Curated annotation (Swiss-Prot):
Function: General regulator of phagocytosis. Required to uptake Gram negative bacterium by macrophages.
Stretch forming the signal peptide: none
Superkingdom as given in the UniProt entry: Eukaryota
Listed Pfam families: NICE-3 (PF07406)
Compartment annotation: Membrane; Golgi apparatus; Mitochondrion
Species: Rattus norvegicus (Rat)
GO biological process: in utero embryonic development; phagocytosis
This protein's domain notes: N-terminal region is required for phagocytosis of Gram negative bacterium.
Keyword Transmembrane attributed: yes
Membrane topology summary: Single-pass membrane protein
Protein name: Protein C1orf43 homolog
Lineage, highest ranks first: Eukaryota, Metazoa, Chordata, Craniata, Vertebrata
């Protein structure tokens, strides 16, 4: 009995030590993961180290090159007074070709595309009604290329844009003028009325014999009016 109890106590001690070691290992792993997690969040660099799983020599070379980056400095040099690029910038103001805008203005207003807005006006009763779609596309393509595009916008592109703009302005002005003339002619027709001939009022005097021949309903109406006036005066 004593030997069996000693054996059980030894087993219990071993189990307690095993469970304690397991709990300690789990706590150690958990704490280490949390520390690594907070360290990755607080650091400014990438979460994965640079050169991860790379050979040692390559990793050292990468670290050396990255450490040199912060020492690299570049001082821009000003252009000379007789530099051709500076002369081109000074003479651009006298050219007839417009500049490329800096892109500070949005391409659409209030969430609506200007191209679709002009195309919708073609189907309404406005001066833009019936304007060719190709004309609107040419005009807006040139405008967007000059303002927002990164390509070349030279003399030929500007002349094409100016031609489309002049054609659209001519069409709109012609239709506005025709509509104004129609309104003026309609207003003129309304203001001009035919001359009225002078009206003559004819008064016919009845003889005394016919004055007493009044209709019966007229006499009844007169008697009712007299009775009403009498009643109103008494009240």
């Amino acid at each position: 009995m004593a030997s069996s109890s000693n054996w059980l106590s030894g087993v219990n001690v071993v189990l307690v030590m095993a469970y304690g070691s397991l709990v300690f290992v789990l706590l150690f792993i958990f704490v280490k993961r949390q520390i690594m997690r907070f360290a990755m969040k607080s650091r400014r660099g990438p979460h994965v180290p640079v050169g991860h799983n790379a050979p040692k020599d390559l990793k050292e070379e990468i670290d050396i090159r990255l450490s040199r980056v912060q020492d690299i400095k570049y001082e821009p040099q000003l252009l000379a007074d007789d530099d051709t690029r500076l002369l081109q910038l000074e003479t651009q103001g006298s050219q007839k070709i417009p500049f490329h805008a800096e892109g500070r203005h949005p391409c659409s207003l209030m969430g609506k595309n200007f191209r679709s807005y002009l195309l919708d006006l073609r189907n309404t009763s406005t001066p833009f009604k019936g304007v060719r779609k190709a004309l609107i596309d040419t005009l807006l393509d040139g405008y967007e290329t000059a303002r927002y595009g990164t390509g070349v916008f030279g003399q030929s592109e500007y002349l094409r844009y100016q031609e489309a703009l002049s054609e659209l302005a001519t069409v709109v002005k012609a239709r506005i003028g025709s509509s104004q003339r129609q309104h003026q002619s309609a207003a003129k027709d309304l203001t001009q009325s035919p001359e009225m001939s002078p009206t003559t009022i004819q008064v016919t005097y009845l003889p005394s014999s016919q004055k007493s021949k009044r209709p019966k309903h007229f006499l009844e109406l007169k008697s009712f009016k007299d009775n009403y006036n009498t009643l109103e005066s008494t009240l």
